[in-house]
From Swiss-Prot:
Its cofactor is Zn(2+). CDD domains: Anticodon_Ia_Met, MetRS_core. This is Methionine--tRNA ligase. It comes from the Archaea. It is an enzyme of class 6 (ligase).
Length: 573
C-alpha cells in the first residue's frame, strides 16, 4: 500500500494564520506521522508547496514596481522555514509552483486535455487607467449572492460562492479603484460539463469521502457543471501551452492542483528515480488523502478529478478529502487588517509549538465552525496535557522506579481482576479506534478517543492505589498494576506521537525504548514492555501555563507582533 498525503498549497501573499494551519498543513502532518507508523515510512509520501502565481502577487508587484518573483522568492523561503524548522512539519517535499519541474509538467499535462478544451470569447473587465485586463482578484465588487461588498472576481470570501468578474455588482479595479469597461478577449475553457455524470458516479460511490465534501460536490453536479476558463490574461503565471495562446497564462487553480502530482515527480527525480512517482498515482494499491479548508472543496472534489479523468491516463482519484470548517478567533473571523487572530510566526513566541499542535487538533473544526479562545487553550494545556497525560505518565513510571528500582515487574496473567482486564482490553482496542478515525480524516475525534483512554488509565491507577498496595504488602496486585500501567504509558506515547512527536519521544526515552519514529502503530495495542525491562530517568513531561497567561496575552501578543513585523519579507508585511 502506497499512501499519498497532501496539504492544500498555502498562497504566499500572506503569512498563514492558525486557521490556515489547522485547515491543511498541520492536519496533514498529523495524519502523515500516523500513516508512517501504520504503513511504514517507505510507503508514505507527504507533499505540498507554495502557491505563488496569480493576481494577488501580480497586483502587489505592480504597486511596488518589482518583479513578482522577487516577492515570492522571499515569501516562499520564509514560509518554508516556518513550516520545516519552527513547526517541524514532516514534509517529504515542500516545493513551489515556480519549480521548473512543476511548470513543465503542467504544460505537458494540459495538452493531454485538448479533447475537452474549447476556445471561446469571453467578456473580461479592462481598466482603461492601468491598461490591464482584470481577471480574478484584479477586480472587486459586491457579491450577487450574499451582498458582501468586498467580493473578489473569482470567489466571495463571505459566502464561499465561486464567481466570475461579470457577476460582480459595481465592479472596481483592485489597483486604482476605477470602474472598468468590459472587453471581449479569447480564452480557453475546460469543458467540465463532459464530466457531470462521471463526477456524480465517483463521489456517490465513495464510502470514504466525508459527508461535507460529498454534499458540496453533489450540489455542483446537481446544478450542472459548466465550462470554466483555464486561461488568464495575467503575465505572472505559467504560459498557456495551447496554439494561439501565447499571451495567456494558466489559471492558478488549475495549475496549483496539478502540483500534487508534480511534487511527487520532483521528489523522486531528486532521488534519481524517474519512474517511482507512478507508484503513488497509478494502480489499485494506493490511498490518497487531501487536507484542505472547506472553501477549496469544489476545486478538489470536482475540478481535480475531472482533469485526472480527462487525461485518460488512469490517475488515482482522491480517496479522502478532509475539509475543515472555519476556525474562529474569540468569536470573530481571522483578519490581518484588523489584527484579529494569531499568525504562525507569532504563535511560537507565545507557547511551545507542540502545545499549539495539540490545542489546534483539539479545536479542529471537523463538523462545524469552532471557536479558538485563550481560556480553552489554558484548559487544554493545564488539564488535558499536564494533569491527565503528564501526571499519569509521571506517576506510573515514578512508582516503577520507587518500588522496583526502575525494573518493569513480572506479570501474573492468571491473577487479574475486572479492572485489570478492562485496561488491557482498552490497550488492545483503542489504537484501532483512533486509527480508524484518523483514516477518515477525523483527527479531533481520534484525539478525543485517546483522551478517553488516558482518563480510564487515571481512574484505574487511582482505584488500584499502588501506594496502598505497597504498604499492605499486596505484591502480586502491585506488580500487575504497574506492569499494565507501564504498557499503557507506551500506548499513550504512540497515540500522542502524531500530534506531539517530541513529547512522545520524551516518553519513549523515559521508557528506555529507543526512537519512537521507528515504532509500528500496532505495537500500541500490545503488552510489549516486558518484565525485566529497565526504564530510564523520569522527567516532567509538561508545564502548566501560568495563572496570569490569559490576562497578559493581549499585551504580550502586541509586543511580539511588532517584533515579528520587522523581520517579515516585504510581501508579507
Amino acid at each position: 500500500m502506497k499512501v499519498l498525503v497532501t496539504a492544500a498549497w498555502p498562497y504566499v501573499n500572506s503569512v498563514p494564520h492558525l486557521g490556515n494551519l489547522i485547515g491543511s498543513i498541520l492536519s496533514a502532518d498529523v495524519f502523515a506521522r500516523y500513516a508512517r507508523l501504520r504503513y511504514g515510512k517507505e510507503n508514505v509520501l507527504f507533499v505540498s508547496g507554495s502557491d505563488e502565481h496569480g493576481t494577488p502577487i501580480e497586483i502587489e508587484a505592480i504597486k511596488r514596481k518589482v518583479n513578482p518573483k522577487e516577492l515570492t522568492d522571499q515569501a516562499h523561503e520564509y514560509d518554508r522555514h516556518l513550516f520545516l524548522n519552527v513547526w517541524k512539519i514532516s514534509f517529504d517535499n515542500y516545493t513551489r509552483t515556480e519549480s521548473e519541474i512543476h511548470k513543465k509538467f503542467v504544460r505537458e499535462f494540459l495538452l493531454k486535455l485538448t479533447k475537452y478544451i474549447k476556445v471561446s470569447e469571453d467578456e473580461i473587465p479592462y481598466c482603461e487607467n492601468d491598461k490591464l485586463y482584470l481577471p480574478d482578484r484584479f477586480v472587486k465588487g459586491t457579491c450577487p449572492y450574499c451582498g458582501f461588498e468586498d467580493a473578489r472576481g473569482d470567489q466571495c470570501d463571505n459566502c464561499g460562492k465561486l464567481l466570475t468578474p461579470s457577476l460582480l455588482v459595481n465592479p472596481k479595479c483592485s489597483i486604482c479603484g476605477k470602474t472598468p469597461v468590459f472587453k471581449k478577449t479569447k480564452h480557453w475553457f475546460f469543458d467540465l460539463s463532459e464530466f457531470n455524470d462521471k463526477i456524480r458516479g465517483w463521489i456517490s460511490s465513495s464510502n470514504e469521502m466525508p459527508d461535507n465534501v460529498k454534499s458540496v460536490a453533489l450540489s455542483w453536479v446537481g446544478e450542472g457543471l459548466k465550462p470554466r476558463s483555464i486561461t488568464r490574461d495575467n503575465k505572472w503565471g505559467i504560459p498557456a501551452p495551447f496554439e494561439g495562446a501565447q499571451d495567456k497564462s494558466i489559471y492558478v487553480w488549475f495549475e496549483a492542483l496539478l502540483g500534487y502530482i508534480s511534487a511527487v515527480i520532483e521528489y523522486f527525480e531528486r532521488k534519481g528515480d524517474q519512474e517511482k512517482w507512478k507508484e503513488y498515482w497509478f494502480g489499485p494499491n494506493i490511498k490518497s488523502y487531501y487536507f484542505i479548508g472547506k472553501d477549496n472543496i469544489p476545486f478538489h472534489a470536482v475540478i481535480l478529478p475531472a482533469m485526472l479523468m480527462a487525461s485518460e491516463e488512469e490517475y488515482h482519484l482522491p480517496d479522502v478529502i478532509a475539509a475543515t470548517e472555519y476556525l474562529l478567533y474569540e468569536g470573530q473571523k481571522f483578519s490581518k487588517s484588523r489584527k484579529i487572530g494569531v499568525w504562525i510566526d507569532e504563535a511560537p513566541e507565545l507557547m511551545d509549538v507542540e502545545y499549539w499542535r495539540f490545542v489546534l487538533i483539539r479545536l479542529r473544526p471537523e463538523e462545524k465552525d469552532t471557536n479558538f479562545t485563550w481560556r480553552e487553550t489554558v484548559r487544554i494545556v493545564n488539564t488535558e496535557l499536564n494533569d491527565d497525560i503528564g501526571n499519569y505518565v509521571n506517576r506510573v513510571l515514578s512508582m516503577v522506579n520507587r518500588y522496583y528500582s526502575g525494573i518493569v515487574p513480572e506479570f501474573k496473567i492468571d491473577i487479574l481482576d475486572d479492572n485489570d482486564r478492562k485496561i488491557i482490553s482498552l490497550i488492545n482496542e483503542t489504537p484501532k479506534v483512533v486509527g480508524d478515525l484518523f483514516e477518515k480524516g477525523k483527527l479531533k475525534a481520534g484525539t478525543e478517543e485517546m483522551l478517553k483512554f488516558v482518563r480510564e488509565c487515571n481512574a484505574y491507577l487511582n482505584m488500584k492505589a499502588p501506594w496502598d498496595l505497597y504498604k499492605s504488602g499486596k505484591e502480586i496486585e502491585l506488580k500487575n498494576t504497574l506492569y499494565i500501567g507501564t504498557n499503557s504509558v507506551k500506548t499513550i506515547a504512540i497515540l500522542l506521537y502524531p500530534l506531539m512527536p517530541s513529547h512522545a519521544q520524551k516518553i519513549y526515552e523515559m521508557l528506555n525504548m529507543g526512537n519512537i519514529e521507528n515504532e509500528k502503530w500496532d505495537v500500541a495495542s500490545t503488552l510489549s514492555v516486558n518484565p525485566g525491562h529497565k526504564i530510564g530517568k523520569v522527567n516532567v513531561l509538561f508545564k502548566k501555563l501560568e495563572p496570569e497567561f490569559e490576562s497578559k496575552i493581549k499585551d504580550k501578543l502586541e509586543k511580539i507582533r511588532k517584533d515579528i513585523e520587522k523581520i517579515r519579507p516585504t510581501l508579507l508585511k
